[in-house]
């Protein structure tokens, strides 16, 4: 009797889409191609939203009776971008097979910016460049044209928003080290947001990259039956290209990005939100940044706990975040793990002052390989302006340490992600610890609530491993599982080596000897 065939697991829709789009990339660098693809996804989103509202205005029923479908104010009133005729998706699709399609798309982007001042200098105009084959661009337009089946704006925004976010992550992986400069891994953002729980208030990210922290904050509120309108976001980004991605990423989610600012001087030299006092700060600043213009800011009023060294911005960022917190505000951010132990150039003294001031709430040691742009070990800091209440129990004189180095799983030989279970485990530990009736327990090898006296004993070093100790049980080592993991990693390395050797050989064959 023939064995029944196992059902073939269908590949996720966004993964299929990514493979198809990547195939059309040909010889274009991933860093450039992402603007081409993401710009088109954005254009499809605003065109779908526009067409849906326009059909209601044309029907002229109920509240839309007597409305003019060509009146820009009608669209503005419902937070929908006005899309002129030459920029509508139907027009692009009708012209997708023409050799002039690149020029048509660039003109569409220009027209949208003219009619929507909030998008001025945001959209990419890169489609008529010589390295983008018109046939491939037409294929990409057809591909993206099939993303949102059905015309409901909410469905379209949800699907297109998800695809946009997925593609951001895939482009970051494709770019490797450079990709990490505009993208914080999704699982890290989810962990920060799940721990901070920004249900209501002002959320600030002064180094916002492509806006992932904001998108996740809004998602968090929606998933917990909160009201999205109770959150307002403020951000700043010094890289204009990345800022453009952030503006599109937020617009496709219908999130107001009017307070997400760009200037090339950055948050330290040109703080775009000088007077802002936020309820939440959530950020992933550049690790160990040595080029932050610290020599120009020696007497800055933000350095309340000590002047940070000019050669490393870690403790400048910490104090910048604290400066922007309101009296009951909470900050959660990523830093290089060295920030927990460093004593060079006065950093140890600043850390001591922060601890003695009762500002450090929780430290999380992260697994390796989570970040695309660096192999530097990372950690999360959580700081609270008021540990005595703020809706939680009095935690004055305590710091929670979580060692999450063993969490997460590999998705390829270079990259790891935290699963939903990992995120929940870490976040729940923090919540149980800080809540009034939380059933928190120290777990050897994972978490420990340490007294300020204990931190003093260890000379203000904040490495979680120093506090949590070794796990009670070391005998649950699974040899088969570990062997299989190592074998898979080794096979991936061999494949990558084979690919690189073939590429080198191909390039050598192109060299013509005179």
Region roles according to the model:
Residues 1-199, 261-272, 365-368, 386, ...:
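Non-catalytic, mostly N-terminal accessory regions of nucleic-acid modification and defense proteins
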């Amino acid at each position: 009797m023939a064995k029944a065939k196992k059902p073939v697991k269908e590949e996720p829709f966004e993964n299929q889409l990514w493979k198809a789009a990547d195939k059309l990339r040909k010889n274009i660098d991933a860093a450039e191609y992402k603007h081409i693809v993401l710009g088109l996804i954005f254009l499809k989103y605003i065109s779908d939203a526009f067409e849906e509202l326009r059909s209601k205005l044309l029907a002229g029923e109920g509240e839309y009776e007597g409305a003019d479908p060509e009146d820009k104010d009608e669209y503005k009133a419902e937070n929908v971008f006005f899309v002129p005729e030459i920029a509508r998706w139907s027009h692009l699709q009708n012209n997708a097979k023409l050799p002039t399609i690149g020029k048509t798309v660039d003109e569409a982007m220009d027209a949208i910016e003219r009619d929507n001042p909030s998008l001025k200098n945001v959209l990419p105009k890169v489609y008529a460049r010589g390295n983008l084959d018109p046939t491939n661009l037409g294929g990409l337009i057809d591909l993206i044209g099939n993303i949102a089946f059905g015309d409901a704006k909410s469905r379209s925004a949800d699907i297109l928003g998800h695809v946009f976010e997925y593609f951001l992550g895939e482009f970051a992986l494709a770019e490797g080290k450079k990709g990490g400069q505009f993208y914080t891994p999704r699982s890290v953002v989810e962990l920060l947001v799940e721990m901070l729980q920004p249900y209501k208030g002002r959320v600030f990210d002064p180094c916002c990259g492509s806006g992932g922290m904001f998108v996740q904050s809004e998602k968090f509120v929606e998933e917990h039956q909160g009201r999205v309108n109770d959150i307002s976001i403020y951000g700043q980004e010094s890289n204009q290209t990345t800022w453009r991605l952030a503006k599109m990423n937020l617009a496709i989610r219908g999130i107001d990005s009017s307070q997400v600012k760009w200037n090339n001087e950055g948050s330290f030299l040109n703080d775009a939100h000088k007077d802002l006092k936020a309820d939440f700060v959530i950020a992933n600043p550049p690790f160990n940044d040595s080029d932050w213009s610290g020599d120009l800011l020696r007497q800055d009023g933000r350095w309340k706990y000590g002047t940070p060294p000019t050669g490393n911005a870690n403790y400048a960022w910490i104090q910048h975040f604290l400066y922007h917190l309101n009296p009951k505000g909470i900050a959660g951010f990523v830093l290089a793990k060295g920030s927990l132990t460093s004593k060079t150039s006065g950093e140890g003294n600043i850390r001591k002052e922060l601890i003695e001031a009762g500002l450090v709430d929780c430290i999380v040691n992260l697994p390796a390989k989570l970040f695309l742009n660096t192999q530097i070990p990372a950690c999360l800091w959580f700081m609270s302006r008021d540990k005595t209440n703020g809706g939680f129990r009095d935690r004055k004189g305590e710091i929670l340490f979580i060692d999450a180095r063993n969490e997460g799983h590999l998705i390829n030989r270079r990259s790891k992600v935290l699963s939903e279970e990992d995120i929940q485990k870490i976040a729940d530990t923090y919540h149980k610890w800080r809540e009034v009736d939380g059933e928190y327990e120290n777990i050897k090898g994972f978490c420990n609530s340490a007294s300020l006296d204990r931190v003093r004993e260890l000379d203000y070093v904040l490495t979680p491993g120093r506090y949590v100790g070794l796990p009670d049980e070391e005998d649950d080592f699974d040899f088969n599982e570990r062997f299989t993991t190592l074998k898979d990693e080794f096979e991936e390395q061999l494949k990558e080596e084979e690919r690189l050797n073939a590429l080198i050989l191909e390039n050598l064959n192109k060299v013509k000897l005179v």
